[in-house]
Regions:
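Alpha-helical transmembrane segments
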Residues: 12-42, 46, 50
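Mobile, glycine-rich extracellular loop/lid and propeptide segments
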Residues: 1, 14, 194
Length: 357
């Protein structure tokens, strides 16, 4: 009996250890998936050799021109010739570290039967330098472009020009370097759906549907409120004007909470960027009408509706959340925008004759 009892304890111990091991391995695997969903491996059209860039910042990592040489023919970096200014290669080192990636060939390979990367990857996503032209139409008939949104650019944010400072850079970093409330959802919904709880409505099912993404605390930014029309955009315009004129900025202090049904069903307008051009028969060129307020007002009015059909928030049990707070539209909208552009007369003419203006 003692032997049998001891043996049963041994089996129980082994079972417990095995269960713990399996649980720990599953937890580690889940953490790895969650982390990679937030920080995926990205291959861009161009890259830079960081080691070359970093080494250019120190004298030991660069080649100086005009320095004396020792008897072995090596540069003497202990000091230059008195009365002479030597050269430290900085920009040339940086440029030599730049590389260009052939993404067209890479995509062909990934889509071919030769590639086995898809077997080991959760998803392969493609992004394009295409941004849907989205407008908000207010009750008074005025229109405001909300994507791409140039509001923060007016404040000197999101740029690296002479007006940018460490303060604006810090602000942009805190906003995730995103100067627009709108952004595209990953094409593979399995990457993010399990990380979020649907608080109202549903996830987008059509190209012209979008979802409001809350922070883990259930909040949206005041910037998003202006984009959605829940706060008067004239208030924001006034702050920008005061800032531009170096005046004291009147910042609103009162903000209220919003019910889900106040966000649900909000509509925006999609405009085909090709439609902002009209052909001039007299000069035989395409002219932009983007600055013509009456033309743009009519164009926006005739645009397709983009509707918020859901509100989501990070699940409190999720170890990571890959979406940022704002308004997310499906990848199918980007595909629609590209197709509509390809079908336009101006693009067809330019494809047939690149010299077309």
């Amino acid at each position: 009996p003692l032997t049998a009892f001891a043996g049963s304890i041994g089996f129980i111990g082994i079972a417990l250890i095995f269960s713990l091991s399996t649980g720990v391995n599953a937890y580690i695997a889940d953490m790895e998936r969650s982390t990679l969903s937030e920080y995926p491996l990205q291959i861009l059209s161009s890259g830079v050799d960081i080691t070359s860039f970093l080494s250019s910042g120190s004298s030991g990592g660069t080649t100086a021109t005009g320095l004396p040489t020792d008897e072995d023919g090596k540069k003497d970096t202990s000091g230059g010739v008195e009365g002479m200014v030597s050269v430290r290669q900085l920009i040339t080192k940086m440029v030599s570290g730049l590389t260009s990636n052939d993404l067209t060939s890479l995509k062909k390979y990934l889509d071919s039967d030769e590639s086995t990367i898809a077997d080991d990857a959760t998803s392969i996503e493609y992004s394009y330098s295409v941004s849907p032209q989205i407008y908000r139409q207010d009750a008074d008939g005025s229109v405001h472009q909300v994507n791409p949104d140039s509001t923060l650019s007016m404040l000197g944010l999101g740029s690296s020009g002479p007006g940018s400072t460490s303060v604006t850079s810090s602000l942009m970093n805190s906003m995730g370097s995103n100067t627009s409330v709108f952004y595209q959802l990953p094409a593979n919904s399995a990457l993010y759906k399990s990380q979020y709880e649907v608080k109202a409505g549903r996830w987008p099912e059509k190209p012209t549907e979008c979802v409001a993404v809350l922070s883990k605390y259930g909040t949206v930014t005041d910037y998003a409120l202006y984009s959605m029309g829940l706060r008067d955009s004239a208030e924001l315009d006034k702050m920008i004007q005061q800032f531009a004129q170096n005046q004291n900025v009147d910042v609103p202090s009162e903000f209220r909470s919003y019910r889900y049904d106040e966000l649900m069903g909000l509509k925006f307008k999609l405009v085909n960027s090709a439609d902002t051009y009209v052909y001039d028969d007299t000069y035989g060129i395409w002219k932009s009408k983007a600055d013509d307020k009456d033309y743009m007002k009519q164009l926006v009015e005739n645009g397709e509706d983009i509707t918020i059909v859901g509100i989501v928030q990070p699940d409190y049990t999720a170890s990571a959340s890959m979406l940022t707070s704002g308004i997310a539209y499906p990848a199918s909208l980007t595909e629609k925008v590209m197709k509509d552009a390809a079908d336009s007369d101006i693009v067809k003419q330019q494809m047939a004759d690149p010299a077309t203006n």
